[in-house]
């Protein structure tokens, strides 16, 4: 199975600008990518990392500055044909992902396997149907369910918090420190981020 990991390497994670500088956002993006690559390789697969700009990574990086929709739809068209082929796509900002969660994503035999994000996005999918295409705008998990059914594909979903947790906002950083011991968590700790508890709520504060 072909497995792609698209990543924005040019101006990544702009919604973290209130807590991270541009260089730090890039470094943190590389750390999250390292966690995803490690999980995929541990599950016995070779990830194809595709970035909008060069990035440091343990595996080769293909630079492609197209948007996410045209990139992934081109991968679908070139990989999934009437006779054979399967494509998995896993987003690069899933630092909680593990070998086991990747195996859960790849295990079902449905034409389309979807991993919803907590905010209504689609954090990962597997496609074996030649007519399925993606549109990541808005509540994409809802749209991808409908698209799969419209083309006559069988659909299943993987209920995994580790696949569902993408890191976009400052509040999301607590999830990394709470539930991961990988490269992204290490980077946050080395950068001075620590968990705090205020009024019964766990948050993150930077102390240096």
Curated annotation (Swiss-Prot):
It comes from the Archaea. InterPro entries: CofC, Nucleotide-diphossugar_trans. Keywords: GTP-binding, Nucleotide-binding, Nucleotidyltransferase, Transferase. GO terms for biological process: F420-0 metabolic process. It catalyses: (2S)-2-phospholactate + GTP + H(+) = (2S)-lactyl-2-diphospho-5'-guanosine + diphosphate. Coiled coil: none annotated. One of its GO terms (molecular function) is phospholactate guanylyltransferase activity. Pathway: Cofactor biosynthesis; coenzyme F420 biosynthesis. It is an enzyme of class 2 (transferase). Its EC number is 2.7.7.68. Belongs to the CofC family. Homodimer. Guanylyltransferase that catalyzes the activation of (2S)-2-phospholactate (2-PL) as (2S)-lactyl-2-diphospho-5'-guanosine, via the condensation of 2-PL with GTP. It is involved in the biosynthesis of coenzyme F420, a hydride carrier cofactor. NCBIfam families: F420_cofC (TIGR03552). This is 2-phospho-L-lactate guanylyltransferase. It comes from Haloarcula marismortui (strain ATCC 43049 / DSM 3752 / JCM 8966 / VKM B-1809).
């Amino acid at each position: 199975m072909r497995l792609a990991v698209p990543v924005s390497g040019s101006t990544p994670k702009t919604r973290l600008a209130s807590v991270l500088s541009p260089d730090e956002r890039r470094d943190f993006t590389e750390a999250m990518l390292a966690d995803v690559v490690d999980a995929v390789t541990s599950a016995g697969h070779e990830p194809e990392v595709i970035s909008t700009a060069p990035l440091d990574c343990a595996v080769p990086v293909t630079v492609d500055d197209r948007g996410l929709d045209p990139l992934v739809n081109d991968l679908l068209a070139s990989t999934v044909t009437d006779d054979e082929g399967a494509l998995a796509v896993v987003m690069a900002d899933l630092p909680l992902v593990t070998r086991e969660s990747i195996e859960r994503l790849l295990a079902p035999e449905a034409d389309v396997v979807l991993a919803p994000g907590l905010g209504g996005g689609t954090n990962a999918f597997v496609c074996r149907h030649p007519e399925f295409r993606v549109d990541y705008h808005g509540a994409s998990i809802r749209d991808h369910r409908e698209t799969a059914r419209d083309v006559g594909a069988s659909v299943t979903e993987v209920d995994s918090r580790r696949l569902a947790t993408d890191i976009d906002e400052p509040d999301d950083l607590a999830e990394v420190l709470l539930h991961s011991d990988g490269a992204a968590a290490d980077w946050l700790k080395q950068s001075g981020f620590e968990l705090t508890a205020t009024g019964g709520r766990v948050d993150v504060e930077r102390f240096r």
